[in-house]
């Protein structure tokens, strides 16, 4: 059973029990765009306890907000009671959630018109805010008054840029003006929330749109000021590390620690960005791997769109790391810190003369060079 078939089964069971039930939000938008749907969210007139009673396998994930996760045929679906939200005193979360009686009231609380459409199991579309028209013209527009929407929840501004990058949509002028007016509200957002939205934008078909977040002033909360970006680099992004390396190239002030990146991704991004510039040749890649390790080497190749170069080097078996030397530290005629220095000297030599990575030859060189490492 496909996810769509399982979602239809949930909608049908709700309807059979006498409730209204609709697929809603991004799944409807993506269906109309012919895109792959990853998550089917639903809204219903049924109260949370009624949903819990109707489905044998479900999880009460957010009862205070009316959400129950229904497990059906190996898929998980968020089913939420029609609701309205009031008061956003923290600029992020509603102060109160109330259950309402109509789909229209539920759709009115949503962020953008393209996300405010509902589809029933028979394919009937409810579009009260012009979402389908905006899909046609590839526009991202707020539901209702844009400034009000952004004052309610500052994260919506970052989501606007992210959606525009993922979908290739323009942001409607009034919505764009409201973003500029409300950008200071993003200071209430956590670094983790900002990081997640920036990364999704960076990994979209239009990653350069991430610089709009900077231009609007939405990234002040993570120490980044408008007007500090360089032109977007022509690079290939295929992982979180390459995404953040590209961002670092365009925004030199970007600090992975403030953005709460994990240590490995942050290190890879910074090191890879620092190495980007000259043409990437096989000889240069060998030096990068020898000095910085395979993770940085692969990341740099990916950034250049030359992953085949890393694969070629791995297949060759050429010595580019200390572990590939034909001898180990135990074979050397030195002790203590001199071991590491001599191994590094031998590796540097082998990078220049690959044929010398042979035990007898390396021991000869070690005997000659040992005095220089003491």
What are these regions (language model features)?
Residues 1-374:
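Catalytic cores of the polymerase beta-like nucleotidyltransferase superfamily
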């Amino acid at each position: 059973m496909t996810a769509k078939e399982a979602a239809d089964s949930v909608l049908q069971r709700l309807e059979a029990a006498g409730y209204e039930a609709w697929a809603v939000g991004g799944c409807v938008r993506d269906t109309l765009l012919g895109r792959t749907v990853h998550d089917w969210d639903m809204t219903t007139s049924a109260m949370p306890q009624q949903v819990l009673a109707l489905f044998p396998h479900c999880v009460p994930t957010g009862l205070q907000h009316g959400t129950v996760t229904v497990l059906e045929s190996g898929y998980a679906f968020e089913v939420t009671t029609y609701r309205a939200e009031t008061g956003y005193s923290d600029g992020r979360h509603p102060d109160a959630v109330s259950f309402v009686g109509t789909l229209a009231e539920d759709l009115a609380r949503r962020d953008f018109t393209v996300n405010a459409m509902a589809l029933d199991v028979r394919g009937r579309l409810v579009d009260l805010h012009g979402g389908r028209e905006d899909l046609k013209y590839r526009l991202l527009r707020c539901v209702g008054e844009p400034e009000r929407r952004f004052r309610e929840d500052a994260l919506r501004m970052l989501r606007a840029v992210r959606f525009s990058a993922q979908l290739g949509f323009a942001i409607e002028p009034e919505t764009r003006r409201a973003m500029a007016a409300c950008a200071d509200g993003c200071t209430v957002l956590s670094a983790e929330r900002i990081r997640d939205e920036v990364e999704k934008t960076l990994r979209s078909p239009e990653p350069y749109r991430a610089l709009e977040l900077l231009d609007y002033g939405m990234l002040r909360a993570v120490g980044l000021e408008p007007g500090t970006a360089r032109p977007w680099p022509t690079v290939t992004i295929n992982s979180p590390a390459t995404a953040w390396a590209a961002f670092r190239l365009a925004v030199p002030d970007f600090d992975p620690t403030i953005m709460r990146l994990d240590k490995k991704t942050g290190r890879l991004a910074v090191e890879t960005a620092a190495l980007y510039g000259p043409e990437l040749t096989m000889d240069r890649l060998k030096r990068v791997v020898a000095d910085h390790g395979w993770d940085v080497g692969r990341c740099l190749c990916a950034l250049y769109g030359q992953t085949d170069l890393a694969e070629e080097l791995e297949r060759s078996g050429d010595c580019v790391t200390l572990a590939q030397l034909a001898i180990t530290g135990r074979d050397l005629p030195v002790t203590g810190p001199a071991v590491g220095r001599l191994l590094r000297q031998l590796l540097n030599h082998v990078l220049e003369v690959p044929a010398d990575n042979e035990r007898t030859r390396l021991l000869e060189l070690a005997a000659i060079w040992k005095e220089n490492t003491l």
